[in-house]
């Protein structure tokens, strides 16, 4: 064993550091790509459509006039809630899938 307790000496440590830096750059690039993406969710057969970006921010909400009923506000609230929730779930799934491929299932919980 080489000095410092690292098998193979400092060469292996340098390689590990380079790999970690490369992975960090790839993850940052992937995160930027995801943040620029848009995800759509809909409810009521497309009567309500919500769009979020990869930062999970609501960027658009479209409501068809025929679903606006002043006597049934609760239905409209449910449709909006469902559409936004679906869009957010798509954003989360895409983020997890892409980052999972990049990290190779290294088990890095809480990153994304």
From Swiss-Prot:
One of its GO terms (cellular component) is cytosol. Keywords: Cytoplasm, DNA-binding. It comes from the Bacteria. GO terms for molecular function: DNA binding. InterPro entries: YbaB-like_sf, YbaB/EbfC. Disulfide bonds: none annotated. Pfam families: YbaB_DNA_bd (PF02575). Its main location: cytoplasm. It is found in: Cytoplasm, Nucleoid. PANTHER family: NUCLEOID-ASSOCIATED PROTEIN YBAB. Belongs to the YbaB/EbfC family. This is Nucleoid-associated protein CPE0046. It comes from Clostridium perfringens (strain 13 / Type A). The lineage of its organism: Bacteria, Bacillati, Bacillota, Clostridia, Eubacteriales.
């Amino acid at each position: 064993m080489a000095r410092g307790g690292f098998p193979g000496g400092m060469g292996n440590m340098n390689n590990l550091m380079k790999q970690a830096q490369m992975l960090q750059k790839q993850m940052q690039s992937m995160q930027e790509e995801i943040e620029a993406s848009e995800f759509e969710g809909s409810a009521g057969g497309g009567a309500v459509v919500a769009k979020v970006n990869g930062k999970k921010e609501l960027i658009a909400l479209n409501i068809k006039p025929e679903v606006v009923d002043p006597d049934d506000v609760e239905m409209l609230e449910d449709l909006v809630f469902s559409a936004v929730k679906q869009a957010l779930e798509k954003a989360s799934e895409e983020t997890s899938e892409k980052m999972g491929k990049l990290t190779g299932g290294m088990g890095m919980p809480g990153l994304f």
